[in-house]
Amino acid sequence: MAEIKAFRGLRFTDKAGSTGEVCCPPYDIISPEQKKQYLAENPHNIIRLELPKTAEDTDEAYGKARAYLNEWLDEEILKCDEKPSIYIYEMVFDALGSSYSVKGYVSLVKLEEFSKGIILPHEETLSKAKEDRFNLMCATGCNFSQIYSLYMDDDNKVFTLIDNASKGVPDKQFTDPDGVTHKLWCVSDEAFIADLASKMADKKLYIADGHHRYETALRYKKFVAENKQDVGTSEYVTMMLVNMENSGLVVFPTHRIVRDLENFDVNAVIEKSKDYFDIETNLSRTDSTAKLDKAYKDGKKAFVLYCDGKYTLMTLKDTSLMEKLMPTASKALRELDVSVLHTLVLERIFGIDKENMANQKNLTYTRVLDEAIEAVDNGSADCSFILNPTRVSEIRDVALAGEKMPQKSTYFYPKLTTGLVMNKIFD
């Protein structure tokens, strides 16, 4: 099963500046303007290496990232730890009116093809994003950020082990602009590392966030094997590993925004939907949110259509309909809210096919409810769909069935910060 390994983490030294100034959110949620802001605050921010190329840059940006990396290594702005270590990582945050803590650990994980069933994906990926990550790995030979993965540990033995090893003052700690406190402990004790590896040896891993980076790491592993004598740690990738039963795991919904449809008629859409859904129209925002939440708690498949200032709750009448529409899919996949929306509404009623969805021609995504509403109100979108979050158990069940959810089915919050610890693949 999963093989984990300690590594000599590449970390910023005090020469770089404060920890909070050199870390940033994941590259794929940072705009060119935000990148400039991070670098204005501190020119050593990890975004200079992790996101060298934006829409404004050419492919030469990857080479520049390598040059900066070498410069920072020479100046000891970045430095590898002396001993192979496991890095215990905790995020403390507020969400949905409550306080949470999620604690896991960062290690190397041996790369495995998905077909082996050891490391399991749950979402589809886009080729453009993978090409960018591959070019960056080839240029720098580093994992700058971690793949976020989950494992099952019903008796909590792994968590107890890492929790006991992180009782002292963290090696690094900062609070980001969103109010999330990030803590990191470096543990090099060989007995601890061996015990952790043993406890993980029977476990499957479920990728929560970072599918593009994992598939890129698989490709890079093959590239190195074919082109280099020294493979370094290219047969591994860095992951943040968290118990699937951790009470701090928070998944936000990702809402759908539909735009640029020809002859869009919301009344016709609602009329067609009545064959498949129980419809409640003319709801207020407050009522629609409350009813959507109740549907979630009751295990019903539902979402809210927003158009012309009106909220319409759509609740699937009969889940057996999805079996007819997705006959080869598992029960876990076809009964997801996003599967019902994509297959029954977007494809069947709206006529938006899978390729269109992948290219985001008529469909875009946001986790911010106000953005989904504002896009309709300002006329840039025809309508939007407000969804409930996907359950962690649903992610597990789809992955175990060997299937993948539609893109943007999950949004784990908070996102892992980038810059606390990295992996330099070659010494």
Where are these regions (language model features)?
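Surface-exposed, charge/polar-rich loops and edge strands
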Residues: 1-427
